[in-house]
């Protein structure tokens, strides 16, 4: 009996010690975060909470529609494509289906809107929806896209302003390989393997031409892309490594072209020669959008798939100033 009591006391003390160690580690990591990500931590502002982040949703795409209305694209654990509409802090889920009524699959890496047109970047295609229909739909509504457009990139993310939509691809060696014709080494010696293609939009927000006006050569690990005037912004991340928010001034003309379905398209690039600033951020950054003079960014680290972000309160969309 005495042995059992001693064993119980030992285990209790051991448990207390382990909890104390874990608490100290957690506090230490929080403190380190303030130092490692000092610029980000000092200038970031919370925007809104990611929908269903603790209920299986893995957020990827992000779009600010107006005021407190946002669109989110992503997937659930079984790779089921998911779409959320968030208005004034209240979210509803729309379930994308194909023309047969079957659940669509994919990561839904980007989402953007122009007038009444909503575009989701998914598996080399743009899924086109009506914004007014999404806003009017009930929670849990199954909805097929109005149109599916094949594009020249892997369509990992997208961004639209009033006149153009940019559709880009994610690249990492040996894991997410893409068309070798998208490779380009810039004059500064930067080796690129991915493209962001710019398509014209009609006045009503629809795609005016299925051939891009031009393509932009970019580095790998790009999860999100946004443009404000002549400032181009990339969200880059992979795994538990720190994410980066990268700012570039203007586009550089390569003087070359890239082949898109037999059509020669002008090739521009973003590289170290027009890079202005890099902001270090916590891991798992995803899509971007522009709201006023700030860029907003979503993170997937707090979802149930990765968990780690739950320890650091990473369930929010964050904004950072464009300077």
Per-segment meaning from a language model:
Residues 74-77, 123-125, 131, 170-173, ...:
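Short loop/turn segments immediately following the C-termini of beta-strands
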Residues 257-291:
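Conserved blade-ending motifs and adjacent loop-strand segments that build the rim/top face
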Residues 56-63, 103-110, 150-160, 219-226, ...:
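Repeated scaffold domains used in trafficking and secretory/extracellular systems
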Residues 89-116:
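Blade-loop segments of beta-propeller domains
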Residues 48-81:
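Beta-strand-rich domains and repeat architectures in extracellular enzymes and scaffolds
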Residues 215-265, 278:
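Loop/turn-rich, solvent-exposed surfaces of beta-rich toroidal or solenoidal domains
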Residues 82-89, 131-134, 181-203, 244-261, ...:
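Beta-propeller blade signature
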Residues 50-55, 95-103, 147-151, 213-219, ...:
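Surface loop/turn motifs at the tips and blade-to-blade linkers of beta-strand repeat domains
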């Amino acid at each position: 009996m005495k042995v059992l009591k001693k064993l119980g006391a030992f285990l209790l003390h051991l448990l207390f010690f382990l909890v104390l160690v874990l608490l100290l580690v957690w506090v230490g990591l929080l403190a380190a975060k303030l130092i490692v990500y000092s610029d980000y931590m000092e200038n970031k502002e919370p925007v809104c909470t990611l929908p269903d982040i603790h209920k299986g949703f893995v957020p990827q795409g992000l779009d600010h529609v107006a005021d407190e209305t946002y669109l989110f694209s992503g997937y659930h654990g079984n790779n089921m494509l998911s779409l959320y509409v968030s208005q004034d802090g209240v979210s509803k889920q729309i379930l994308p289906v194909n023309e047969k009524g079957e659940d669509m699959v994919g990561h839904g890496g980007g989402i953007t809107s122009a007038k009444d047109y909503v575009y989701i970047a998914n598996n080399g295609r743009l899924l086109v929806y009506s914004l007014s229909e999404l806003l009017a739909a009930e929670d849990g509504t199954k909805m097929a896209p109005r149109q599916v457009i094949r594009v020249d990139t892997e369509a990992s993310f997208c961004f639209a302003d009033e006149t153009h939509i940019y559709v880009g691809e994610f690249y990492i060696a040996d894991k997410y390989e893409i068309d070798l014709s998208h490779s380009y080494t810039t004059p500064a010696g930067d080796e690129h393997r991915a493209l962001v293609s710019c398509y014209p939009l009609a006045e009503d927000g629809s795609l005016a031409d299925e051939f891009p006006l031009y393509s932009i050569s970019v580095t790998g690990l790009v999860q999100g892309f946004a443009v404000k005037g002549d400032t181009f912004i990339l969200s880059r991340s992979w795994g538990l490594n720190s994410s980066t928010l990268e700012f570039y001034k203007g586009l550089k003309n390569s003087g070359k072209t890239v082949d898109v379905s037999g059509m020669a398209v002008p090739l521009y690039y973003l590289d170290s020669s027009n890079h202005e600033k890099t902001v270090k951020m916590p891991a798992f950054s995803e899509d971007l959008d522009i709201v006023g003079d700030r860029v907003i960014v979503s993170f997937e680290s707090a979802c149930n798939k990765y968990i780690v972000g739950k320890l650091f309160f990473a369930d929010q969309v964050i904004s950072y100033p464009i300077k």
